[in-house]
A protein has these predicted regions:
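Bacterial N-terminal signal peptides
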Residues: 6-18
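Beta-propeller blade termini and top-face loops
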Residues: 23-339
């Protein structure tokens, strides 16, 4: 089982737990979970897993997207899998988003959203209205890589899309795009330049009009070595649904002084003022925390193992009920219980 698949399914479990159990839900002995061990549950095709999404009130149903194997769905907790994207012209998947208010509505971003010699690009964003049985292409074809999509919890037609762009050269179809009509049209709302794309976007769990986006300036050469650090990289915040954005950089590394590269970001579901960011840089790399909704940042862990291979992973997640329990993914998955 690849690290990417382990990490994606592990973090999927965290996101699926975000909603509290319904009244009268069956109780369980927590000691049973302590006896569980990692095991391969598939699917057995397509290489590394880049995307995963689940439905909180349907815990047996979840989806994974792999770098060259399309989208797979299970409805029996991973015992069996069905490929549901094979009739589409691309198999490279970077993002899967389920509309929280209507879990039959799925959005899939193609192009895995990495900068590495063996990457695979896609051809835009897709939508399903029937849980993945049928798909329609929506656009953003020239974006080539879509590593993240977030959907308004109350409105399945409002979404923000992170578009990284072509890995091999400049292009204008990069940045954060917004749709308010279910993907019929897209508006570019955060853009820096033709060399800088968006690699991550997250919503404030208490206010969907507040979002945080990560821009990343990087370029993959046709040979082994690429450029993964650039002046365009940084974190941005909106409080008006994406109409306006501003950089939030106080305490974070800069490119000019520290060689800033890729950043991964998350918001604590139980405390929206607490954010964590994994920051790749030539100096001052590490795990950063903000306790004031991103206005200031503090380096809390500089152990290089926590951010190893950050240009590939850059994943950080917080426990749904405990803002001090944090998970990061590098070569291995790390856990902290003290914030």
């Amino acid at each position: 089982m690849t690290l990417g698949r382990v990490t994606a399914l592990f973090l999927l479990g965290l996101s699926a737990a975000r909603l509290a159990p319904a009244a009268g839900a069956e109780s369980y002995d927590p000691a049973l979970l302590r006896e569980m061990h990692w095991r391969m549950i598939g699917p057995h095709r397509g290489g590394r897993t880049k995307a995963a999404a689940g439905i909180p009130d349907r815990p047996g149903v979840f989806y994974v997207g792999v770098c060259n194997g399309g989208v797979w769905k299970t409805d029996d907790f991973g015992r069996t899998w069905s490929p549901i994207f094979d009739d589409q012209p691309t198999g490279s998947i970077g993002a899967i988003a389920i509309a929280p208010s209507n879990p039959d509505v799925l959005y899939v971003g193609s192009g895995e959203g990495l900068q590495r010699p063996d990457l695979s690009t896609g051809d835009g964003i897709y939508k399903s209205l029937d849980g993945g049985r049928t798909w329609r292409h929506l656009g953003l074809r020239a974006g080539r890589q879509i590593p993240q999509i977030v959907v308004d919890p109350r409105d399945p037609n409002r979404l923000l899309v992170a578009v990284l762009g072509s890995p091999y050269g400049p292009g204008p179809e990069r940045g954060i795009f917004r749709s308010t009509d279910g993907g019929e049209t897209f508006e570019k709302v955060l853009y820096r330049d033709e060399d800088t794309g968006a690699v991550d976007v997250v919503l404030d769990p208490a206010d969907a009009r507040t979002a945080y986006a990560v821009l990343w300036e990087a370029r993959q050469a046709p040979w082994e070595n690429g450029t993964f650090n650039g002046p365009g990289s940084g974190v941005y915040k909106t409080t008006d649904g994406g109409t306006t954005w501003r950089p939030i950089v106080s305490g974070l590394p800069t490119f000019a002084e520290d060689g800033l590269g890729r950043i991964g970001i998350t918001v604590a579901p139980s405390n929206p003022r607490r954010l964590f960011a994994t920051v790749e840089a030539k100096r001052k790399a590490g795990l950063y925390r903000s306790d004031d909704a991103g206005e200031t940042w503090t380096l809390i862990n500089a152990d290089p193992r926590v951010t190893d291979r950050a240009s590939d992973f850059a994943e950080v997640k917080v426990h749904p009920q405990d803002p001090d329990t944090v998970f990061t993914a590098s070569i291995v998955t790390w856990k902290s219980t003290d914030g």
